[in-house]
Amino acid sequence: MSGIGSRAAVFGATGAIGGALVHELKARGTDCVYALSRHTATAKADGIIPLIADTLDEDSLAAAAAHIGAQGPLDTVIIATGQLHAPGIMPEKALREIRPEAMAAIFAANCTGPALVMKHFLPLLPRGRRARLAVLSARVGSISDNRKGGWYSYRAAKAALNMVVRSAAIETARRAPEAVVVALHPGTVDSALSLPFRSFIPAGQSVAPQIAAARLVTVLEHLHPEQSGRLIAYDGSIIAP
């Protein structure tokens, strides 16, 4: 069993960071990793179990939680989902670019979906021992750290997600005082999310998904209950809300 437990679930397992997290958890000794995604493309391997679950489909989340929960509690849950852009949707540079349907889609992907995962999967954390749920957020969701403006929908959705994490941490502590619920900032990662902005990223400031995953798992290994509800960067530092 690894330092973050024997049983884990990763949402967004077919994404760059999510897939890397699945393999990093296994490499560090987690016995069983459930790899959840909307379309199962993760190959079944020793200790890696692919499952279909859509973060915006409560029936699929309930079914996945029931299936996994029947096998026992989870030591680690990681929600590695999110959306910055999509066909016809790009981050806004000015207020005049805000469109309600685009903003709703970004909020759904970055806040509503993870909140629904918490609703169904936080009850699977054990009551009497250390466990953790982490969701990928972003530094741009920090209100106090916003110096450049823009990216209205994405920034607001991540700020809302950070508030959901805080409230979920408070609620979870009443049932499972050793559990830790956090938002994680992975840094800039070579992925589909950052691809349209690659030319604007200074050399050396973007890392491979495998490096990002290793950093995040190290952070998870050292979490303690006093950090619950916080936004934590890949280097373990606390980001102010």
Name what the model sees in each region.
Residues H23, A115, K158-I170, A179, ...:
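Conserved active-site helix of classical SDR/Rossmann-fold NAD(P)-dependent CH-OH oxidoreductases
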Residues K26-K44:
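Conserved glycine-rich Rossmann-like NAD(P)H-binding loop of the short-chain dehydrogenase/reductase
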Residues H67-T81, A86:
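A glycine-rich helix->loop->beta "capping" turn
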